[in-house]
Regions:
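Central hydrophobic cores of alpha-helical transmembrane segments in multi-pass inner-membrane proteins
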Residues: 18-24
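Interfacial loop-to-transmembrane junctions
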Residues: 128-154
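Alpha-helical transmembrane segments
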Residues: 10-17, 39-42, 67-71, 143-147
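Functional transmembrane core segments of multi-pass inner-membrane proteins
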Residues: 24-25, 30-124
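Hydrophobic transmembrane alpha-helices of multi-pass small-molecule transporters
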Residues: 51, 123-127, 131, 156
């Protein structure tokens, strides 16, 4: 009986931990252009065990493996972007990616792809608008974590 009431509670708690971290990081990144590692670390150590427990409760190891593969894939993508952008994409964003990758890929590959695309499209569109309005220069850096947060939230909710 209790099992049915808590059917996806562990996944829900993992999502809450992730979004709480994303909210804090969005505020910090927006104000300082810094992404503290201790918060990204807390996100990983709080969300990953809950996702593992959810996979064990539902006896579906393939979801868990997909989640870990998604964490690695997003980390590699963000790392590549960080290298190619020569500092335009921060290490904090790269270090945040496994937390987002495991949560979204655990839910499904489509969530991972949508969350990633939403993040970059939102950042691109809003940056273009700010450039057009003169609020942002071509060489200015933007805080990317808020876009990651909104993109991830949209992928989970839609």
């Amino acid at each position: 009986m209790l099992y049915r009431e808590l059917d996806r509670a562990f996944l829900t708690f993992a999502a809450i931990a992730t979004f709480t971290g994303l909210l804090a990081l969005s505020i910090i990144d927006g104000a300082t252009h810094r992404v503290p590692r201790y918060i990204t670390g807390l996100m990983i150590v709080s969300a990953v065990p809950l996702i593992v427990i959810d996979a064990l409760v539902h006896v579906d190891i393939t979801e868990l493996l997909r989640g870990f593969a998604g964490a690695v894939a997003l980390f590699l993508l963000y790392s590549l972007i960080g290298i190619l952008s020569r500092g335009g994409f921060g290490r904090g964003d790269v270090m945040l990616s496994p937390s987002i990758g495991i949560l979204l890929a655990y839910r499904g590959w489509d969530d991972l792809v949508r969350g990633t695309v939403y993040s970059f499209v939102l950042a691109g569109v809003l940056s273009a608008v700010m450039l057009a309005l003169g609020q942002l220069g071509r060489r200015d850096h933007i805080a990317f974590v808020p876009y990651i947060a909104v993109g991830t939230l949209l992928a989970v909710l839609i």
